[in-house]
């Protein structure tokens, strides 16, 4: 499964050593293919598209991040483009038919 993971810094800044550890951790995830991409925000924090077998595996990975307790998280599961289109279209047609009476 793919997830969009957003990390937003909390009120306490990390130490320079924590920052370095977090940067190295992210670089390792990019190198091994765990992360498809990572982008940062000008004001701090950022997003990653990551691959995980399931929610529990993603949570495990998040807790391994060196700044885990210093950021707040927003996680969204992702679908591949067009994944689920047939189901959505069928449900739209069903709803349209129901409204037509």
Provide a role label for each language-model segment:
Residues 1-101:
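Conserved, structured core segments of small domains
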